[in-house]
Amino acid sequence: MIKTEEDFKNGQVLLIDKPLNWTSFQVVNKLRWEIRQRFNIKKIKVGHAGTLDPLASGLLIICTGKQTKEIHIYQGQEKEYTGSFTLGATTPSYDLETEIDNAFPTAHITETLLKETTQQFLGNIQQKPPIFSAIKKDGKRLYELARKGETTEINARTVRISEFEITKINLPIIEFRVVCSKGTYIRSLAYDFGLALNSGAHLSALRRTKIGNFCVDKADSIENFIESLHLDSKKSETTP
């Protein structure tokens, strides 16, 4: 179905499969620019309903026009992630953005221990966000302070984990699936999971597969969205 300028202004909900090494902000900017170019308009509202780190891929909900007023609804929905933790080592950012800073034993870790430990994280838990995060404190992003080497106290927050399962074990790497509430940091889950194992861990891969009832397998790549947008342009020019 051909989408018009009015369709985008009245509001569209776009499902985009964010690639690795893109920020969520870059995806929003790219789509906004393409929509503006397609319809030769100066301004249109475009926003996302929940950020993904550059080192994560998967589902982004992008809202346009009047639909941006509903972003908070999508932000509040449960999210599903799959990915991997690397056991036996930690990093300051809790993922691959920074180098390993400490190594820990893993010889005692068994499949039984792994699966028993997941149970500690189900339900409402207290979680501290990573120091390398976009959360603001005293007007500054935490990652700005972290990159300057400044230390700061971070308060724990209540988050909810509905499901947490280990899907594959190939030590030191384990694969997982998590269903969690808004505000949950999977990087922090990796770090805390490592501590609970009397070891260490960091997030080595992450993909968001669901937000509420929206699934990543229904999402477009950025390239496919742009192609269909301009294909609509050609169709509309040839339609009598």
PLM region descriptions:
Residues M1-P240:
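Catalytic/RNA-binding core of pseudouridine synthases
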